[in-house]
């Protein structure tokens, strides 16, 4: 599979100079042999930059393949589009677009988004702008990509310049919230970030134990509740204070899973948000809502409610590798205007991937 330069440049920016030794790029002694020529200085085939470039390419290819594999079920649903467009002709436009519309609906693009996409294609076909099946396919992909890559929609984490940056992880029960936090910690740690975890889920008895396992697994420090009746806001406040005093880069704050209809628990999130903001001005930098990809369009009411209460800055969509409803990604971004930051495309610790709109579109419309 070809790996785009965008993927390579993105990944190059994600490799921290502090993590080079950990990923096997050092020591350099005896290996880095620059060759001077009249025009340039280049590294030998076994040198640092050669190995760094190879590592970046391999990592980029691996990440793209994971995303491609993760959306296999959605891609199967949408494969009918290729069949429809293979022998497309103008006389069959209405039939083809009706079946294309059905394929998008089955994949949970939602009625509003689906109608908008199909009617735009119809208009371009009838005006003569689109004259072949391949042109229609390209226009379909471009239309979806435009919805995902809106202006001012930042898919990267916005961590600001004050340390520590604070990231709150919120969501309903069973969405993969604590697991996503652990995987995010693993990713940040491997990039050379000093990470502190905060076990703010004081409602579920096993939550703290689960996060402690993730802390041990990722090599991160953790702050847990003192006593059975500790308040979540107190735990998070204590963690952010420690993060500030001990020079941590990021504090990842777990919170109790809650139904979006439970007002008292939603109020607790407001208290948590205020508590961390008192320690570090502008915190939390990110409030990430974890949503189960298997719920499809049913995630929209959850996202709306959480957003109204605490102001969601980004989404983590989990369990998409087992879902045929990948179109919900487009719906939630387009209807709520909240960017997807990460997607879960597998059970492995490395399978929480930064969301790349172009890679996503290529994965569902192969």
UniProtKB/Swiss-Prot annotation:
Expressed in green tissues. Low levels in roots and seeds. Belongs to the GTP-binding SRP family. CDD domains: FtsY (cd17874). It comes from Arabidopsis thaliana. GO terms for biological process: SRP-dependent cotranslational protein targeting to membrane. It comes from the Eukaryota. Residues 1-40 form a transit peptide. Unlike eukaryotic or prokaryotic signal recognition particle (SRP), the chloroplast SRP from higher plants lacks an SRP-RNA component. It targets both chloroplast-encoded and nucleus-encoded substrates to the thylakoid membrane, post-translationally for the nucleus-encoded proteins and co-translationally for the chloroplast-encoded proteins. Changing residue 71 to V/A/L: Reduced interaction with FFC, but no effect on the basal GTPase activity. This is Cell division protein FtsY homolog, chloroplastic. One of its GO terms (molecular function) is ATP hydrolysis activity.
